[in-house]
Every structure is written in structure tokens, then in C-alpha cells.
Amino acid sequence: MNNNIQQNDAQRVKILSEALPYIQEFRGRTVVVKYGGAAMNNSDIKDTVMRDIVFLSCVGVRPVIVHGGGPEINSWLDKLGIEPQFKDGLRVTDADTMDVVEMVLVGRVNKEIVALINQAGGKAVGLCGKDGNLITARPVGKEGIGFVGEVSSVDTSVVESLVNSGYIPVISSVAADETGQAHNINADTVAGEIAAALGAAKLILMTDTAGILQNYKDPSTLLAKLDIQQARELIQKGIVAGGMIPKVGCCVRSLAQGVQAAHIIDGRLPHALLLEIFTDRGIGSMIVASGYTNL
């Protein structure tokens, strides 16, 4: 028994030792995490993610969280007798649906995440794109989809003030245009644009897949590291397809604007965030600008 305990303790020390150079590298640096997918629906995984976020904060990393909430929106639309509709992969967002989206993302999902982080020992503050003019939206310009927006501009003053004071900003992807009309914006897009505006060290997208796969049916074909050009070629060849295209595109845009590394990881795995940031092997796909050689 004692031998087993010693082996377990030795393994813990080894893990902490392996994490040290990464902690040193990213201490004081901003990491933007897009939290969504199945990690939001499983209570055990949800609690693990919140503890990981607090851990990042405790070791000096400056986490900024951007979240989605699609399943919760669908659930409330169903309760209210509004049938969810999608067109070209975008949620059709008429006035009634926009009210529900804002109510759910800003009033429920956001506050739950804030409460869970605070319960885990962190100091979280909830925001949406409207707060402090953080995000100014504009319509995507497609007919028949209503108040679906994209990011027109970002003002990170309120986020920087919170981060500099030791708080963890939690941001929902609802923003207003210049007339004050609320728009629903893809959370991956919001995370990428905020990461770029903050000059983040990392953008991490938590998804329901292992990462970028050469063969989407075979998890063993995971591409652990690639650069912008390789990522673009995978899209052109059709290897990156379907719902992965906008995620990879979001990563590429953020890198082109100065983010050092963008990661696509499986949020369903316990401690996925810490495994990706603080271990040599990582667990997902990291996309970097050409020539980037840091940790």
C-alpha cells in the first residue's frame, strides 16, 4: 500500500514538474477559452472545466471565457412554443427568438458559469457584448436569418480592467449594432476576435471532437500541430469540412491578427484545458503562425 502511495505521489510530482515551464511561459499572459458543446451539458465535466479555469487563474494565467449555449436556447424555445430554425448553418433569429437568445445566454447561462467559477474559488464577472461597448455588431447580410450578427469592432477596455484587477471575465456572444439592436453572434467568432484584440497568447476552442483529424472517422489521425498554411490547405482539400471549417477559419483569423497559438480540443475529456496547456504532448490540435516555435 505504502509503495503504491509513493508511486502515486511521485507521479503527481512528475506532472507538476512537467507543467512548470508552461506555467512560467504563460504566467501573466491572456488565454481566451471558448466554452461550449457537450462540456456545458454534463455536470461533472462542467465542474471540472470551472476548476481548471480557476487553476489557470491561481498560477498566474489570465483566463477570459466566451461561451455559447445552443442546447439551452433550443430548450427554452421549445418551452415557449417557438420552433428553432436554421439556414446555412445559422440560427434564424427573428425578434421573438432574439429575445429568448438574449434571455438565455445573458440571463441564465452566463450567470450559471459565473456562479460555478466563484464557487470553485475564482472571481468571475459576467458580461455580454453590450457591456462597455465590448463588441459592436453588424448584420451578417444574408436574407431570411434575422438578427444574426458578426463582429464589427471590439473595445476590450472593460475586459482589461477586470483582468488587471484579478477577475475572470465570462462573456456571452450577444451584442448590439450601432442602432442598439441586439444580435446573436457565433461564440467561436467572438472568442477569436476578443483574443486578437487582447493580444492573447492562446485561443482555445472547446469542441465535441478530438481536434483536426486527417480522417474524421479515425481519432488516431489527430494532427497535433500545424501552421496557418497547412490549415488552409486542409480546408481546400476538403479534409477539414462541415462544422470544423468555421472553427479552423476562426483560429486562422485570430493568428493572422497576432494571437500566438490557437487550439481545438475535445471539451468532453476531463481536465482538457490543463492537459492541452501544461503538458508536453497536449491532447488536441494546435495551429500556429508560420515560424512560431515557443511552447
Swiss-Prot record:
It is an enzyme of class 2 (transferase). It catalyses: N-acetyl-L-glutamate + ATP = N-acetyl-L-glutamyl 5-phosphate + ADP. InterPro entries: AceGlu_kinase-like_sf (IPR036393), AcgluKinase_fam (IPR004662), ArgB (IPR037528), Asp/Glu/Uridylate_kinase (IPR001048), Glu/AcGlu_kinase (IPR001057), NAGK-C (IPR041727). Pfam families: AA_kinase. The record marks K34, K247 as: Transition state stabilizer. It is found in: Cytoplasm. Its EC number is 2.7.2.8. GO terms for molecular function: acetylglutamate kinase activity; ATP binding. One of its GO terms (cellular component) is cytoplasm. GO terms for biological process: arginine biosynthetic process via ornithine; L-arginine biosynthetic process. Substrate binds at G69, G70, R91, N184. Disulfide bonds: none annotated. Keywords: Amino-acid biosynthesis, Arginine biosynthesis, ATP-binding, Cytoplasm, Kinase, Nucleotide-binding, Transferase. Pathway: Amino-acid biosynthesis; L-arginine biosynthesis; N(2)-acetyl-L-ornithine from L-glutamate: step 2/4. Belongs to the acetylglutamate kinase family. ArgB subfamily. Catalyzes the ATP-dependent phosphorylation of N-acetyl-L-glutamate. This is Acetylglutamate kinase. It comes from Microcystis aeruginosa (strain NIES-843 / IAM M-2473).
